[in-house]
Design a protein with these regions (language model features):
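N-terminal leader/targeting and accessory segments in enzymes
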Residues: 1-17, 273-275
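Phosphate-binding loop of NTP-binding sites
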Residues: 13-143, 147, 151-159
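Acidic, Mg2+-coordinating active-site environments of NTP-dependent enzymes
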Residues: 1-3, 108-250, 276-277
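Buried hydrophobic packing segments
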Residues: 15-18, 46, 50, 72-73, ...
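A general structural signal for well-ordered alpha-helical segments in protein cores
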Residues: 15-19, 43, 66, 95, ...
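Conserved beta-strand scaffold positions in the cores of enzyme catalytic domains, especially
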Residues: 5-7, 30, 56-58, 163-165, ...
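Active-site beta-alpha connecting loops in nucleotide-dependent enzymes
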Residues: 237, 255-297
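Thr-Gly-centered strand-to-loop micro-motif
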Residues: 59-60, 85, 201-202, 216, ...
């Protein structure tokens, strides 16, 4: 046809450069979220909490790749006040590239597991790749890290930006205590400095409490009032976990993706769930685990 076009040597690079240019024109703060597992739910929770105060732009679906992030940024508008973008990777160097496109003001690293270990070679390599989210941060940028992850703790000397921990460990700045499940909801006490707040989540599992801690931390950093944070968290449902009651059976559908860490988290929900009868786990295989796949299974 007669449509104008621009001829480029590399269409992917061109798309990324256009997206980076577009992002630079927008002054809104953006929070980048990465991690082997938990990044989508954490990103959704952060966005939900921030909606207690702002008009929020967030990743569309799971468009967190080298192609997906530029496509997502295409939908950014001048009405948006704050952004929460997911940053995925399957090969070395990809998080740095996404950081150059997004230029996040803050980076969140949820977890370092074994997803994509086939391409990355080791958990150490995966960890350093995830921590490369710091490369795209501005001078005054900072990190929020999962303080319960062994790999993140191991590689702290690699971190060149100010950081805070969230999690269950005693030295985490944003902490949860007294976690319990009641009537299909998760209750916990949020601890920050000398502050103590009772929180209610509509999703199950300790891993979701961890995700919620990241969301609360970001909410407080961006001045969302605590009452609004509580209200937003209590109405969060997320895309990942559906609980269906039918004919006396309870089905917990947590089937979006499978890695050893997410599988363990789902099995813990199943074992903690109050049931009068049998508990049945329906599991698929887990991909991209390399030569250690049998032992992970």
């Amino acid at each position: 046809g007669d449509a104008p076009y621009i001829k480029v040597p590399d269409t992917l690079k061109a798309m990324q450069q256009i997206a980076a240019y577009y992002r630079k024109k927008m002054s809104l703060p953006i929070i980048g979220v990465t991690g082997s597992v938990g990044k989508t739910t954490t990103r959704e929770m952060i966005a939900h909490v921030l909606r207690g105060k702002y008009k929020v732009f967030e990743t569309i679906g799971n468009q967190n790749s080298q192609v997906g992030v530029p496509l997502t940024l295409d939908h950014l508008s001048s009405n948006d006040e704050i952004g929460v973008l997911e940053m995925g990777m399957s090969e070395p160097g990809q998080i740095t590239i996404l950081g150059e496109i997004i230029h996040p003001n803050m980076g969140v690293v949820t977890n370092v597991g074994v997803s994509h270990i086939e391409m990355m070679g080791s958990r150490d390599n995966i960890c350093r790749e995830k921590l490369d989210i710091q490369n795209g941060l501005p001078e005054d940028g900072s990190l929020l890290l999962n303080g319960d992850n062994d790999m993140i703790r191991k590689h702290l000397s690699y971190v060149k930006k100010p950081y805070e921990f969230y999690g269950f460990a005693p030295d985490c700045a944003y902490r949860a205590e007294n976690i319990r499940e009641e009537n299909g909801q998760t209750h916990f006490t949020f601890c920050y400095n000398s502050q103590r707040e009772d929180m209610v989540l509509n999703v199950l599992g300790e891993h979701n409490v961890s995700n919620a801690l990241a969301a609360i931390a970001i909410g407080l950093k961006y001045d969302v009032p605590m009452d609004a944070v509580k209200q937003q968290l209590s109405t969060f449902s997320g895309q990942r976990q559906n609980i269906i009651n039918t004919n006396g059976y309870t089905v917990i559908d947590d089937s979006y993706n499978a890695s050893p860490d997410s599988m363990k988290a789902s099995l813990k929900i199943l074992s903690d769930f109050h049931a009068d009868g049998r508990r049945i786990a329906v599991l698929s295989d887990m991909l991209e685990l390399g030569p250690d796949a049998p032992s992970y299974h």
